[in-house]
Design a protein with these regions (language model features):
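Hydrophobic alpha-helical transmembrane segments
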Residues: 1-132
Length: 132
């Protein structure tokens, strides 16, 4: 069985982009209520893949944490520490995306979005591999 499948990717895209309102998108990193409502609506398409409460709770909970606390930026910063010491940068020297401040904003935002999506897909894959 594949770890991440096309139906999981489709459920992720529908939940994270089609069902997410502008209010959820702009407020989820500032307010737990917005992040919680987004996490619940995000989880709805996964009802087509599983009815297992543990899988759905894991998908919802990890989505809440990743989005509310922008966990992808820490992953980005950590991966960029795997460089020679003269290239690495301290957390205070990073932008809100986790990249160095001299990286063009358009690039750092898109790379953060990609990292965020990969984190979600990995968490969903774990949940559905264990509890599907």
């Amino acid at each position: 069985m594949a770890f991440i499948t096309a139906d999981q990717i489709l459920a992720h895209l529908v939940g994270d982009y089609i069902l997410q309102s502008h209010w959820m998108a702009t407020e989820k990193t500032k307010r737990s209520l917005a992040a919680g409502i987004h996490a619940v609506t995000y989880t709805l398409p996964f009802l087509y893949l599983t009815l297992n409460p543990a899988a759905l709770a894991f998908i919802c909970g990890t989505h809440f944490a990743i989005d509310r606390f922008r966990l992808a930026r820490f992953v980005v910063w950590l991966k960029n520490q795997q460089t020679p010491s003269r290239v690495g940068y301290a957390w205070p020297d990073s932008s809100a995306t986790g990249y160095p401040k001299d990286v063009p904003p358009w690039l750092s935002v898109w790379l953060l979005i990609i990292a965020d999506n990969i984190l979600h897909l990995i968490c969903n894959g774990i949940a559905l591999s264990i509890w599907r």
